Curated annotation (Swiss-Prot):
Enzyme Commission number(s): 2.4.2.7
Catalytic activity: AMP + diphosphate = 5-phospho-alpha-D-ribose 1-diphosphate + adenine
Protein name: Adenine phosphoribosyltransferase
Lineage: Bacteria, Pseudomonadati, Pseudomonadota, Gammaproteobacteria, Alteromonadales
Self-association state and partner proteins as the record states: Homodimer.
Amino acid sequence: MMNQDSLALIKQSIKTIPDYPIPGIMFRDVTSLLENAEAYKATIAILVAHYQSKGFTKVVGTEARGFLFGAPLALELGVGFVPVRKPGKLPRKTISQTYDLEYGKDTLEIHVDAINANDKVLVIDDLLATGGTIEATVKLIRELGGEVSHAAFVISLPEIGGEKRLQGMGIEVLSLCEFDGE
């Protein structure tokens, strides 16, 4: 059971910026949570408590804000942290996955030796909207032989459908707070 006071603190710490980056969008700014040490600590503590007994061997965070939650979570769980990045940012041999955006395509990469067939992987990012980034990340992990069945997010925008998309891939989703709209 998650501490409701901590969850309320987390949600209250996330500022909403209207009409950013374009008119009609209500941007959920997770950096305001990071500025609040108590809220940031509560976020990591809730995630650790939820996942500490699940047997994960790696935490994978997506560029860039997934790193801010994934690295401290991995440290607290005592497992390795693996970054998934935009093309050309990782120095060793990589594999890539291209995915669709609303207006175009994007690509993510992971080191080929970062995940192996014995790894049980938790994926984390700051926000779940369409689920495209995490779908691509899951495909990369599975291509390397890793087992991935859980993804965690600080924020979810359930109306956009990302959770259903990930559940369709066999991913159990945890979101610490939900907001309406885009």
